[in-house]
Amino acid sequence: MKKILLLLVLIVAVLNFGKTIVTTINPYYLIVSQLLGDTASVKLLVPPGANPHLFSLKPSDAKTLEEADLIVANGLGLEPYLEKYREKTVFVSDFIPALLLIDDNPHIWLDPFFLKYYIVPGLYQVLIEKFPEKQSEIKQKAEEIVSGLDTVIRDSFKALLPYTGKTVVMAHPSFTYFFKEFGLELITLSSGHEHSTSFSTIKEILRKKEQIVALFREPQQPAEILSSLEKELRMKSFVLDPLGVNGEKTIVELLRKNLSVIQEALK
């Protein structure tokens, strides 16, 4: 009887490890990998250094999606190439109440409150349905992530509270949700990846010159994009990383790294 039970356990383990979860962007790869451990094969579609707004499928990418048992995607227009794979795709943005979303801004993974209350719990539910025999382990990992997020939230409030009501300028609106949560106004040079800076935006920046406390860009953007503003505002720009191009191992580590950059910029 014991041999039969052991055989059944081994069969279930083999079947599960044979399952493939594909995540479109690195932040969800970090979360799903931490939740599942070695329970399944977790693959990343868009490399961290690539621009997910401009990503298009190569034949090898299409093959990866075809072979996936589950696809974890952001939604909010970030992955238009997933239309034919919708039946096996979970869009993380569906976990978040529509009233909390800002227009079509897709950068929900950078909001630690969204992660704590919607994204991690939502992915936990999806994964325990896929791997019910691993519920205990997945729950433990989810609790570890939430505990880390609590620390990030606490540290962010402590660091940013003195700057409530101040203004931050970014080249791209990736940290819109984050700065809103902690009471700072964000002005972006463009509303998306393919829009140039409008004259009205420049006027707003100059009008709020005395309120601006930091300038940021992303790793994929050239330093020159903020050079004129650096001169005008007499302020150095810093790099915030929305995707984890420097090899962060967890989503909490990614948020912590960005918080440390923000703190450095505010000194």
UniProtKB/Swiss-Prot annotation:
Protein family membership: Belongs to the bacterial solute-binding protein 9 family.
GO terms classed as biological process: metal ion transport
Record's protein name: Putative metal-binding protein TM_0123
One Gene Ontology term of the molecular function aspect: metal ion binding
Alphabetical keyword list: Metal-binding, Periplasm, Signal, Transport
Chief localization: periplasm
Organism in which the protein naturally occurs: Thermotoga maritima (strain ATCC 43589 / DSM 3109 / JCM 10099 / NBRC 100826 / MSB8)
Location(s), subcellular: Periplasm
Alphabetical list of Pfam families matching this protein: ZnuA (PF01297)
Chain segments annotated as coiled-coil in the UniProt record: none
InterPro entries attached to this UniProt entry: Bact_metal-bind_prot9 (IPR050492), ZnuA-like (IPR006127)
Protein's job: Part of an ATP-binding cassette (ABC) transport system involved in metal import. Binds a metal with high affinity and specificity and delivers it to the membrane permease for translocation into the cytoplasm.
Lineage of the species this protein comes from: Bacteria, Thermotogati, Thermotogota, Thermotogae, Thermotogales
Signal sequence range: 1-15
UniProt keyword Amino-acid biosynthesis present: no
UniProt keyword Transport, yes or no: yes
Residues given in the record as a divalent metal cation binding sites: 53, 107, 172
A GO cellular component annotation in the UniProt record: periplasmic space
